[in-house]
UniProtKB/Swiss-Prot annotation:
It comes from the Bacteria. Binds 1 Mg(2+) ion per subunit. The magnesium is bound as Mg-PRPP. InterPro entries: PRibTrfase_dom, PRTase-like, Upp_B, UPRTase/APRTase, Ura_phspho_trans. Allosterically activated by GTP. GO terms for molecular function: GTP binding; magnesium ion binding; uracil phosphoribosyltransferase activity. Pathway: Pyrimidine metabolism; UMP biosynthesis via salvage pathway; UMP from uracil: step 1/1. This is Uracil phosphoribosyltransferase. Belongs to the UPRTase family. Uracil binds at I194, G199, D200, A201. The keyword Cell inner membrane does not apply. The gene is upp. Catalyzes the conversion of uracil and 5-phospho-alpha-D-ribose 1-diphosphate (PRPP) to UMP and diphosphate. 5-phospho-alpha-D-ribose 1-diphosphate binds at R79, R104, D131, P132, M133, L134, A135, T136, G137, G138, S139, D200. NCBIfam families: PRK00129.1, upp.
Length: 209
């Protein structure tokens, strides 16, 4: 079974509270999302391998550690996932960025794919799939299905807020994918929205309805 890592850092929880507030506008919402994604990046990349290198400080030569050339890819689920990309890329500037376009049918709540553009060497990369919301889990499962069909082998999922139902759905179909969240919320309501959640992340991010 995959692990679920809830990042309870005080700064993340503070910024998430501001994002939940219905009076927070799109500009602040975007900035907070970028900041939280960057802070979550420290936990998500905790297991990246290191190697020793020889360097020379202003004082003397020494052995020190650098990331061991691991190839990374960040894959946002469009469109809300775009809001998490800049924060992670600021930590991992060499990472490639692909895109998976899915929307949730309002009647069936099932994901519908409309776009997919991935790095050609996707099978050689450690992948971080990002989406602020993990609600029913349908979009995340569909995105991971698609990535695996393209050869992806090492995948993590990063969300701001998740419903227990969404976590269970991802683990049901992809028990090899670890899930990183800022908060596991209470449940889904009858419309498939996370309670208490933060509303429609895409609409709040881009100022649309």
């Amino acid at each position: 079974m995959s692990k679920v890592v809830e990042t309870n850092h005080p700064l993340i929880q503070h910024k998430l509270t501001l994002m939940r507030d219905k009076n927070t506008g799109s500009k602040d919402f975007r900035e907070l999302l970028t900041e939280i994604a960057m802070l979550m990046g420290y936990e998500i990349t905790k297991d990246i391998p290191l190697k020793d290198v020889e360097i020379e400080t202003p004082i003397q030569k020494t052995s020190s550690k650098v990331v061991a050339g691991k190839k990374l890819a960040i894959i946002p689920i469009l469109r809300a996932g775009l809001g998490m990309v800049d924060g992670l890329v600021s930590l991992m500037p060499a990472a490639k960025v692909g895109h998976v376009g899915l929307y949730r049918d309002p009647e069936t709540l099932k994901p519908v794919e409309y776009y997919c553009k991935l790095p050609q060497d996707i099978g050689e990369r450690d992948i971080i799939v990002v989406d602020p919301m993990l609600a029913t889990g349908g979009s995340a499962v569909a995105a991971i299905d698609l990535l695996k069909s393209k050869g992806a082998k090492s995948i993590k999922l990063a969300n701001l807020v998740a419903a227990p139902e969404g976590i269970a759905e991802v683990q049901k179909y992809h028990d090899d994918v670890d899930i990183y969240v800022a908060s596991v919320d209470e449940r889904l309501n009858e419309h498939g929205y996370i309670i208490p959640g933060l509303g429609d992340a895409g609409d709040r991010l881009f100022g649309t309805k």
